[in-house]
């Protein structure tokens, strides 16, 4: 038995009008200066080519394709940024040239040639990794969460890979772990550097979130992560900046049960180019009295999340959160002009913030909730505004124990500038949809059991609009935006990805991608990544899901035998032209926060679905 709670008193028409008034007031957000990202993928006959439309160039930009100096297209290509060349060979060299007012204005670098295919719908290549030796405590290493950034400023993405030891532990379980390592690799497999977080950072899903982003606008990404005495940077040096200047790097602060509930805690920013320490500050929120977080042995005090957000509108900041089961705290940080400074802090223990206790998830999301050109931080049941003030939480409207395990935030209605929040709840349980600026839900299915998963996305172009589903009895139904049942839900309640060429998303679960047909109540398998595996156990996440190159659709990365990463890209045709998702700031910061605790799929900052308008509104961005 479940209860369908009817919509709260909320005038969406009035809200939409109000929110629309704010559109156009925002500054341009700084994003990466990307290259064209041209790839050529081997097919049964010839090659399939795919490249970026940049968010900084006119939507109508035309392109010419050249193979070995010969132009292949008769008329400029003004549709989807893909092209098939049936006469290409592995020895061919491809470039694409952009046209402005009929004249060619730039030429891409030669295409990355991808010679391996997985069935008719995907190409792939492998990135060799330098697997660490077995740890001092017997832990063997596997590549875990991965992030992307332009570390050297060449306009191409590099990868930052977290190595997790096999003796990693959840916060709820005792045990001593080996060290956590961060590696940086080019897509060709060159190891750029390795950071060792040391023995005073415990290994586990909730301990280390690493933010990879160009925080200072110098055209290269930095890495910001929690550190401690014993952390060694990518140049082989113990960290020595700020409060770490006189740190005892030989000290071991973990106790006999493996928890680390004493000793210094830092936040360090590292140079993406060489892994060198740039600056270190005292980590905030501080640990303080361990029992103030809900237990005394070290579980809830060390529940961390992190994200990147454009809090001031133009430049990105990092946000690090501590605690969500009881006390909820976070701090925003800026890396500017060679200094790491705290922008603001939020603490549910401060007067006026008491209702925010327990109002947090196992992840964060980021969106422009107020449509004012600045990002807010969504903890799931709560929203913290761009100035570090609590905007709202659902303690009184939905669930006093607002904690949940999944979170989806994006624009979900055509023509509506409001982002919406969909999430499952633990405790009293259920699935709820609400506008991101309000605690008042549109609908709330309340079953009274723990809902561990929930997803929001348009799944089928034949059934227009966003679809919502989750685990549990209610979750076996598929709902539309109005809370009406439209079919059965798929068995996958995990990631969603743009893959097959339409504007709906496909199901990404474990090492498979499937298209769900609502009316036929069945999936179509599009990809099985043979030999590759997902990460995080039953969470079955990819190492990374992101639009790394090629057209606007997403790539997916899996672990291959702990020695390689395998990168898959679609070869399915599309008729749609969109700028690279990585130039949409909301999507781009989602790639940064994707590695936070329970990984969630990235969503864009504007409405992408079958009934969207074309061309999409220009992105308000600039490059360094």
Residue spans for each PLM region:
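Short, solvent-exposed loop/linker segments at the N-terminal edge
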Residues: 39-44
